[in-house]
Amino acid sequence: MSVRMGLIRKKADWNVEDFRAYWRDKHGKLAARAPKLREYWQNHVTDRLQRGIQFARGPWDFDGFSQLSFDDQQQADRAFNQSDMAAALIEDENRFIGHLHIVTAEQRVVVPVPPQEERARLLKRMSTLKRRPDVSEEDFRREWKIHGDYVQKMPGVAGYRQNVIVARELVKGEPCGYEDLPIDGIVELWFEDTETLDAAFSSPEGKVTMQHATTFIDEITAFVVEERRVV
């Protein structure tokens, strides 16, 4: 499964409520027409606090994350670069989006996410990760996989997915290098509520987990989001 993720910043002259409504009610229906699309989720940012973590934040200040799942990256590229809807999608994005970065990720499920009815009641946090400058891409991926074993032992984790970034577009449609968009991974974590999240990271298991994180991660930029399934 290949996941195409849009890292979205609204236009400065749009308020948060109008941005969310347009993305949800108008743009979502257009993007849902992408051929071969398996799933489409919108994640609306509601909080930017570094709950439970002591890492520096990166420069990112997103208002939302889109997640569109395809069988492979080639299907995603055709849908958004070669299909009949591609031009219409860009035209609509220019109405309400100020900045849009695109990343393609290989998704790894560490703690399975509950069924949708239960999932809808949970708190979700997404975080972008940047590796330490002395850690290679290969070593980062290896250590992050090991890190998943630590997270599994933390109390209260209702779901956990790792999205390993394999392609980047600082400007949509223009592939770029790591230096232009230095994000190595995107975390998805689900908890019952903020109290459960705080308790997980302050637990002995949580402290061990975050100590391991310091061995390969330089920046963690956390966002609490409200997720909505479109497809």
Residue spans of the language-model regions?
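Macromolecular interaction modules
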Residues: 1-231
